[in-house]
């Protein structure tokens, strides 16, 4: 069973977690020219 030999300090854990970045999806232009988020329904045209 995998058990750590030593406790990981708060600083060390925080340094490791700095690489877990969240990237936001970029908005795309719809057929009517409005910007929307991808994979969302446009309320005016009803397109996905």
Curated annotation (Swiss-Prot):
Record GO terms (molecular function) = structural constituent of ribosome
What SUPFAM superfamilies has UniProt attached to this entry? Answer: Zn-binding ribosomal proteins
GO BP field: translation
Residues folding into a coiled coil are: none
What's one Pfam family here?
A: Ribosomal_L32p
GO cellular component terms listed in the entry, alphabetical order: large ribosomal subunit
Asked if Ribonucleoprotein is a keyword of the record, the answer is yes
- The domain of life for this entry's organism is Bacteria
Give the region (Disordered) as residue ranges. 26-48
Q: Does the keyword Ribosomal protein apply?
A: yes
From the Swiss-Prot or TrEMBL record, give the protein name.
Large ribosomal subunit protein bL32
